[in-house]
């Protein structure tokens, strides 16, 4: 672990660059959740509820 730390220090990585990279990565995760995961979850819940209602109403006929 110490070797990796020394390598990063020797490569002149600054804390500001690392911080900006981490903020960008977290922002990407949030954007992915908003654009992909949440709409897909809402769609699957909607479809499963609709299917449940269709099966219930079909069974009563």
From Swiss-Prot:
<dbReference type="GO" id="GO:0015979">
    <property type="term" value="P:photosynthesis"/>
</dbReference>
<comment type="subunit">
    <text>PSII consists of a core antenna complex that captures photons, and an electron transfer chain that converts photonic excitation into a charge separation. PSII forms dimeric complexes.</text>
</comment>
<comment type="similarity">
    <text>Belongs to the PsbX family. Type 2 subfamily.</text>
</comment>
<dbReference type="GO" id="GO:0009523">
    <property type="term" value="C:photosystem II"/>
</dbReference>
<keyword id="KW-0604">Photosystem II</keyword>
<keyword id="KW-0602">Photosynthesis</keyword>
<dbReference type="InterPro" id="IPR009518">
    <property type="entry name" value="PSII_PsbX"/>
</dbReference>
<keyword id="KW-0472">Membrane</keyword>
<keyword id="KW-1133">Transmembrane helix</keyword>
<feature type="transmembrane region" description="Helical">
    <location>
        <begin position="26"/>
        <end position="46"/>
    </location>
</feature>
<protein>
    <recommendedName>
        <fullName>Photosystem II reaction center X protein</fullName>
    </recommendedName>
</protein>
<dbReference type="GO" id="GO:0031676">
    <property type="term" value="C:plasma membrane-derived thylakoid membrane"/>
</dbReference>
<dbReference type="Pfam" id="PF06596">
    <property type="entry name" value="PsbX"/>
</dbReference>
<comment type="function">
    <text>Involved in the binding and/or turnover of quinones at the Q(B) site of Photosystem II.</text>
</comment>
<keyword id="KW-0793">Thylakoid</keyword>
<keyword id="KW-0812">Transmembrane</keyword>
<dbReference type="InterPro" id="IPR023428">
    <property type="entry name" value="PSII_PsbX_type_2_subfam"/>
</dbReference>
């Amino acid at each position: 672990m110490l070797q990796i730390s020394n390598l990063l220090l020797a490569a002149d990585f600054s804390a500001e660059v690392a911080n900006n990279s981490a903020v960008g990565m977290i922002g990407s995760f949030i954007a992915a959740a908003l654009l992909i995961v949440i709409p897909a979850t809402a769609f699957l819940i909607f479809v499963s509820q609709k299917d449940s209602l269709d099966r219930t109403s079909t069974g009563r006929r």
